[in-house]
Amino acid sequence: MMKEVLSTGQGNTEVIHTGTLQRYQSYHIGDFCFQEIEKEIHDIEFQCQEDERNGHEAPMTKIKKLTGSTDQHDHRHAGNKPIKDQLGSSFYSHLPELHIIQIKGKIGNQFEKSTSDAPSVSTSQRISPRPQIHISNNYGNNSPNSSLLPQKQEVYMREKSFQCNESGKAFNCSSLLRKHQIPHLGDKQYKCDVCGKLFNHKQYLTCHCRCHTGEKPYKCNECGKSFSQVSSLTCHRRLHTAVKSHKCNECGKIFGQNSALVIHKAIHTGEKPYKCNECDKAFNQQSNLARHRRIHTGEKPYKCEECDKVFSRKSTLESHKRIHTGEKPYKCKVCDTAFTWNSQLARHKRIHTGEKTYKCNECGKTFSHKSSLVCHHRLHGGEKSYKCKVCDKAFAWNSHLVRHTRIHSGGKPYKCNECGKTFGQNSDLLIHKSIHTGEQPYKYEECEKVFSCGSTLETHKIIHTGEKPYKCKVCDKAFACHSYLAKHTRIHSGEKPYKCNECSKTFRLRSYLASHRRVHSGEKPYKCNECSKTFSQRSYLHCHRRLHSGEKPYKCNECGKTFSHKPSLVHHRRLHTGEKSYKCTVCDKAFVRNSYLARHTRIHTAEKPYKCNECGKAFNQQSQLSLHHRIHAGEKLYKCETCDKVFSRKSHLKRHRRIHPGKKPYKCKVCDKTFGSDSHLKQHTGLHTGEKPYKCNECGKAFSKQSTLIHHQAVHGVGKLD
């Protein structure tokens, strides 16, 4: 077993076995202390490094000092005994065995004679900046200290002869071993004033402080990029030199650094040597383990100077800073849309490619994002882990709970920089911004329709496929989107979670509440580009635009009649089915529409809520007041194509058109008599049925025609109903 004599730095002598760490105390070998030799060798090594960097030769005086200082050292110890008394022979006779050999086989300097006749070193010869110490022992076994210095053995400092008993790691010099052992001893004397983190060495603390200050003193001369640590700069420089000499035998991939190759090999072997003591999770890199530990410790050393938010990773801080700077370095090559983070760009690209790599094992549905698949799995499991503390409603996703809590708090943290409008959800803000920019980056190739947000595009795609995977458990009605199903279930449950702060009225849908709030504010944000008319709801604007375009997309399958609005078609269908869902509580008359019933009840109540500001005349319908206004304005918008006669009301024009031949579409089923208007047919059918729906509130007399009732009421002194 090879042994080596080293200094402890405290006047004692350490003897280290190869492969183990054993400590002995010999204090001194005779009157000669090997601590001094090690110190002098260290001084020469340091001076050689300086001279080599400055291009100077190694001064011989330093080398002479190493061998010549032994005379002075002998007199420091009591008794001034010669070395030969303890070692059995003169130390000087064995000094030629001390060599300084240059690294990597370069020509070096060798001490082969005693200091008394040592020749001067040639100027062509240099001492290596990092010399290796070669010590051979010629002392006999009879020496009192032969147990400390093995016979005919050699020690080379480049060998990793110093091993730590705690971790088993080996080093090629004792100073590195001592530094390594400090963490085992728990000696962390350098503390960060910002976050309180402890360090073994002062230089580690200095490097750590740059995380807080953002200092990057090391700059690349090639590209100007700066780094906080010199090791990072060294690694970066290899990108420019592009030297990749380390090759993986498994896959042939090459690396610029051997350390990178070692890390890469762990992918093939699956080796994860770094294990967390808290949760037993294993990692293939120590840096990954260090990052993971912050989850348990809660340490977040990286702080944003703008908003004071803290992060556990530096990369997360760098990404966060882009929120403040507005930087979007990641750009889509297809549609030029820019993104703050690379992950957003990767997600966005799947819109163009249509890639859906994540598949549900339960129903086979595929998703473009893993997070979407994870969320989808909860639908099958019925898991709802997130519960509202106010109303106890449970949600499958935390994001839905956060969104829901804003209903109770009324919080709207997302603000538009253009108009100052605030929103409860970031997605709503993004959709709103497209109103200002006109941007619609999401296009569907099938119908070439464009959308301002990706979720709307995904919803639209289902229209083409006809897929409706979400089914109501109460009525079995199916829906294309889960959100549609959630809204539908509120019809059965009667839940109305959205409440108006002004009048406390509640609504089933958030959009209904938003529309209702405009009643109080009078806001009409939607404007027609044709006539500049404004509307409180987007749907009203869409319907209005059809007046200009003449578009009537809703068609009746029975008679082929077309309508510009879907509710008009729904109401029209009831004419064919005969369905009259709305019934008067006074006279039991039924109506196709609720608005017709509301209009009808005013006959019984004689209510006339709509009053003309010009002449004071009152009306029981808003439409009648609007038509009446045209009398004062002299406006006549409706013209007969046959005789060019104009009318102020559309109904008057329709009635007039029947004067022209062949315009009596309404036929009596009893006597086949035809009429030009539906109202005339209704009056006529009363003759056959004997029905008298119009009743006088004063005397109770009933009439078959409304006009007859109006004339009758004049007898009682009641003003004519218009």
Swiss-Prot record:
Q: Does the keyword tRNA-binding apply?
A: no
Chain positions of all zinc fingers (C2H2-type) = 162-184, 190-212, 218-240, 246-268, 274-296, 302-324, 330-352, 358-380, 386-408, 414-436, 442-464, 470-492, 498-520, 526-548, 554-576, 582-604, 610-632, 638-660, 666-688, 694-716
Annotated InterPro entries: Znf_C2H2_sf (IPR036236), Znf_C2H2_type (IPR013087)
Highest taxon of the source? Answer: Eukaryota
Q: Which GO terms describe its biological process?
A: regulation of transcription by RNA polymerase II
Keyword Repeat in record: yes
GO MF annotation terms: DNA binding; zinc ion binding
An example GO CC term for this entry is:
nucleus
Question: What UniProt keywords apply to this chain's record, in alphabetical order?
Answer: DNA-binding, Metal-binding, Nucleus, Repeat, Transcription, Transcription regulation, Zinc, Zinc-finger
Spell out the subcellular localization from the entry.
Nucleus
Question: Which family does the record claim for this protein?
Answer: Belongs to the krueppel C2H2-type zinc-finger protein family.
Write out the function statement from the record: May be involved in transcriptional regulation.
This protein's name: Zinc finger protein 600
